[in-house]
Amino acid sequence: MKFNITSFWLHIIAIILMTIDHIVIIFIENENILRAIGRPAFPIFAFLLAEGFYKTKNRKNYFIRLLILAIVSEPIFDYVLHQKIPYWFQQNVIFTFLLAFCAMTLIEKINKDRIKTTIIFFASMIVGFLTMIDYNYIGIPMVLTFYIFKEKTKLNLIAQISIITILSLLLGGQTLFTLGQIKIPDEILSLLALIPIWLYTGKQGLYNQWIKYFYYDFYPAHLVIIYLVSRFF
């Protein structure tokens, strides 16, 4: 049986996993092991951003849409997850994507020069740490991994597995299991995202203006809905 996954289905998978993650945070607790279910969501969104960067017809408009979404989502993100507006110690994930967008633009301008690209890759970890964006110092590099190692070759697949494993171990999280004295965090489940990503056909799939804006509006909207349900039910 052959599975053909389009961009539409990648979005749906990531949205479902992200929603589960946020339900656990809001209804149970931030440090609950059930959050492991949602770990593959971010790598899928990271891949979709890199793919969108390649395929969009108008990068300026793409960037502006992300910027507006980041600004609109921030007070919602701050209040729902931190009960404080403003909360300066963690910015929502759309800001992570904005900075990754800038990093990809820089890499494109240097024609993917290996040395300069490597410098940008590691510099992005510092930027992520200093700006306190969601996913901290691994967020931007995760997007860049899919941008730099885009083609479906064996070497690129090995690179994706290796880098995502390292980034996941660096970020940590709740202990999923132990290997001797080594604690393996639940972030390692981010690797599962590679299954639907590798099955991606390169096609957009179901798409229209309603779906386009659903992708953008869902992020702040689902936070509001989950929060309201948690307060009144």
Residues of each region from the PLM?
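Alpha-helical transmembrane segments and their immediate juxtamembrane cytosolic regions
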Residues: 1-233
